[in-house]
Amino acid sequence: MFFSLKNSVAKLIAFWAICLVLPVWAGHYTFDPILLANNNINANANTDLSLFEQGGQLPGTYQVDIFLGDEKMDSTNVTFHAVKSPTGEYSLQSCLTKEQLSRYGVDVDNYPELLPPEKNIQQDKQASQCVNLAAIPQASEEFEFYAMRLVLNIPQVALRPKDEIPVERWDDGITAFLLNYMANSSTTTYRQTGEQQSSHYVQLYPGFNIGAWRIRNATSWNQSGNSAGKWQSSYIYATRGLYRLKSRVTLGQSYTPGDFFDSVPFSGVMLGDDDNMLPSSQRDFIPVVRGIARSQARVEVRQNGYLLYSTVVSPGPFELTDILPSHSNGDLHVTVLESNGTTQQFTVPYSVPAIRLRKGRLRYNLMAGRYRPANVDVETTPIAQATVAYGLPWNLTAFVGGQWSPHYQATTAGMGVMLGDYGALSSSITQATSEYRQQQPVKGQVWEVRYNKTLQASDTSFSVVNSQYSTADFSNLSDVLQSYRRHDYSRRDWHSNSLRNQTHVVVGQPLGQFGYLNLNWSRQNYRDAPASSSWGVQYSFNIGNLYCSLDWTQNQYRGNQDRLLSLSVSMPLGRERDTYAAYRMTSSDNSKDHEMSLYGHAFDNRLSWNVRQTERYAQFHSGENSGSLGLDWQGSYGDIGGNYYYTPTIRQFSANVSGGAVIHRHGLTLGPQINGTAALVEVPGVSGVSTSEDHRLKTDFRGYSIVPNIFPYEEHDILLETTDLPPDAEVTKTDAKVLPTEGAIVRASFSPQIGARALMTITRNNGETIPFGAMASLVNQPANAAIVDEGGKAYLTGLPETGQLLVQWGRGASQQCRVDYQLANAKKGDAGLYMLSGVCH
């Protein structure tokens, strides 16, 4: 008994000694294998602990997480070589390529010694050549074997600026066909006559990705009442990024940018810089569309005559933030079609910020092609445009531009200045010669001033644009070309309602705990027509659990005035916050509505529902009741919803469906609308797994799902929800970093180990225990490995029903063996863990 106790203590001391020295790489340690022996002193005399004596491990390829300091940069397979130090000690050293270091942010161009001189010349060999990290002064690496972490310690002077992501890390994604779709249909029944009227709308956004190329199309179909359905294609184009130039080339049907001239639809070719490739701190932003609906209404948004967006909104304030961009900064013309047939019309300006560039930065755009009108009767006239802006010293920016067609020529020039604490200001003058159809050429001139500022102390943002038309004869390119129609031979005054001046003002003010205030105002004064203007005030705040918002809008359009005031109050019912009660009052010039509603969500926010009841007091009618019931299901494969709306005179049923699809080399994957850039999550063979981006989006029966709407040229962490994994699946890596280019479908790939979990006791065919520290793995699957403990036990995952394990405890052929197993012959515990034993031959 004394010998047994002494033997156990010795084994315990040896085990903890080994554990304590494993993280230490520099020292040399010697362990006596006899300490691990059982009663038979010579049984483990051949135990090979040389792997641990110097804190080392077997060289080879391991899947590791790569860190640059404390920041995770990558998860990939890295080959490690055994290297000997001048003192004779062995350690593992990674084999990283020059391209990898550049992707991780190292300024490799400043360190040519990373590769031997002959390898710097032979570019085709750089992809596989290991760099010499010692070429960077004070750079080092640490390989934490049991955590599978490779930590790179690089001095800050050897790194690129923090917000400058190397082009080498940008991912063009996979070759794929993608489709976004949106459809809604409504049927209105008039109670007095029984007459029914239906309207249907379908919007399709097909596309194809191959390499850096993106092919995109927008096609819509609209049918209302007894009229025939009509298809309309807004655009079809192919585009790709020129990453080194921070530019983009576009072929086909698109829109010119609206920073110097009004945006123009064209068919042709365009080359210009791409702001999206710049760091996020240098990018511009665009506004959203806000308004107030008096009743359940259809909102249509048009740009340059094209229908961009159509949706049904509930009574009260609405905010549209999911309009697919048309690559244009022109004004958005919004029409609100109320259920009773009345309409609202107003314009949402895109207030382009003051033009200001940092010193040395170049912004340019070149386009040549034909004018692409929305009306097929308008001629497709040849057009061209060129604009250039350059950042000068002293915070100045100079810019020039020109437009040309047979009937129109314009030039613009201006200066911008950054005023430091006082914001940014730019001013320009544009001169144009316009020749309307069947009229003599006329010359016009416009001055424009733009100013924007954010007060850092109060976080107040201002944006002001003012245009003064010096003469009555100034026109833009689209207005002139719209007069050239093929089947209209009448002589008319195309140049009516000429602008005298126009102003757009937007002010945003966060108020901390007191809410948020947003003000917007625009006005257009004409020489021979009534002025048009739009006011808007939105104020929202919280009082405990009570949410309140106040919205006021006044629109004056061609002599018609419309004013709307809305007050909304809502609060949760219960602690779960899945059901809310709300009250809304909407007042216009001729009516006042009081609405009570209940709304909420269920099934992990997948199901949204609402019930509304409204009492209307109009000028000639009082006590008119209306109500609605709506349901919407947001699933992994798209959204589907329905709505019922009634008044004393009509009943209306509507339904909508939307979603997206990606066809890739592994098949078809359905999901929500993509609207730009997306990640394809791959967990092969594991269904029902979500990510941290959206818990409602789960992998399909093959293990694939779509994470939509991620920002291009920015790094994203796609985190797998391991709680969704079934008992027979495990993943060693639960996150994937993606850095997509614009429009890319990038892979967020995970490698699940699907199969059983087992604790296996392994002995050799001569009766000896497998040496402590041996590696046991499935044959031909070295990544799925486990370490054998001092009792010959190994915890294994991802095991098939039958298989063979390879056990290694050294480099020689005599230091490995194989063991067969069958799960059917093993005992399975309550936790799903199999208890196995096997003899290694």
Swiss-Prot record:
Note the SS bond partners: 817-840
Where does it sit, as one GO cellular component term? Answer: cell outer membrane
Subcellular location per UniProt equals: Cell outer membrane
Q: Which GO terms describe its biological process?
A: pilus assembly
Membrane topology per record: Multi-pass membrane protein
Q: Does the keyword Disulfide bond apply?
A: yes
Q: Which domain of life is it from?
A: Bacteria
A GO term for molecular function = fimbrial usher porin activity
Pfam families named among the record's database cross-references: PapC_C (PF13953), PapC_N (PF13954), Usher (PF00577)
Extract the signal peptide range: 1-26
Q: What is its main location?
A: membrane
Q: Which InterPro entries match?
A: Fimb_usher, Fimbrial_membr_usher_CS, FimD_plug_dom, PapC-like_C, PapC-like_C_sf, PapC_N, PapC_N_sf
Return the SUPFAM superfamilies for the record: FimD N-terminal domain-like
- Write out the entry's keywords from A to Z: Cell outer membrane, Disulfide bond, Fimbrium biogenesis, Membrane, Signal, Transmembrane, Transmembrane beta strand, Transport
Q: Which family does it belong to?
A: Belongs to the fimbrial export usher family.
Q: What does the record give as the function of this protein?
A: Involved in the export and assembly of the MyfA fimbrial subunit.
* Protein's name in the database: Outer membrane usher protein MyfC
State the organism named in the record. Answer: Yersinia enterocolitica
